[in-house]
């Protein structure tokens, strides 16, 4: 049996390196629905605080938070489902419920008083939970979280987002827009 030669060691080393590195890119680019979620009308979820105004009804005008079950508790009508609805849909739903024996022609407007949080994890200076503001990008969120560590992969990040009730993770570049509720994970670079 021939002894191992330097060429054989080189070939085995390259084969092992190829096998190891082929597992490094297990994420696919974000699906189309992932990107489209950033341009769709905002949908409500747990943690959103809403400013609801009922014209000429100061006792009903107040701030209401979407609870963990996805509902708001509104005077006279009780629990109203809010999760997955746009502001316009919820406004119409509340007006409809108020019309059923409470008010003749209710005028309901809704604004987001405070969006649900985003989370920034991984190779950033201060991982944690942060307030979302409309127009926030991955790069802005990383800056708010103390910037990159020296080990961070600065080319792209993994964002986990709930779309149509499903939790999806996609790899995006740092100029990508984010939405309320996103979790951003900055990976460690290989070299």
Feature annotation, model-predicted:
Residues 2-6, 10-13, 21-191:
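Ser/Thr/Pro/Gly-biased, low-complexity, turn-/loop-rich segments
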């Amino acid at each position: 049996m021939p002894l191992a030669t330097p060429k054989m060691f080189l070939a085995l080393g390259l084969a092992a390196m190829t096998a190891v590195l082929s597992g490094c890119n297990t994420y696919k680019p974000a699906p189309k629905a992932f990107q489209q979620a950033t341009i769709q009308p905002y949908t409500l979820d747990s943690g959103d605080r809403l400013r609801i105004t009922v014209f000429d009804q100061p006792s009903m005008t107040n701030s209401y938070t979407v609870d963990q079950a996805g509902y708001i508790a509104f005077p006279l009508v009780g629990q109203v489902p809010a999760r997955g609805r746009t502001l316009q849909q919820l406004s119409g739903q509340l007006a409809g419920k108020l019309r059923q024996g409470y008010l003749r022609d209710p005028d309901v407007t809704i604004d987001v008083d405070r969006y649900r949080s985003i989370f920034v994890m991984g190779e950033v200076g201060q991982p944690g939970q942060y307030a979302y503001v409309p127009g926030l990008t991955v790069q802005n969120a990383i800056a708010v979280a103390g910037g990159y560590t020296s080990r961070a992969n600065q080319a792209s990040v993994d964002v986990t987002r709930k779309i149509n009730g499903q939790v999806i993770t996609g790899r995006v570049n740092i100029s990508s827009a984010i939405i309320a509720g996103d979790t951003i994970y900055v990976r460690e670079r290989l070299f």
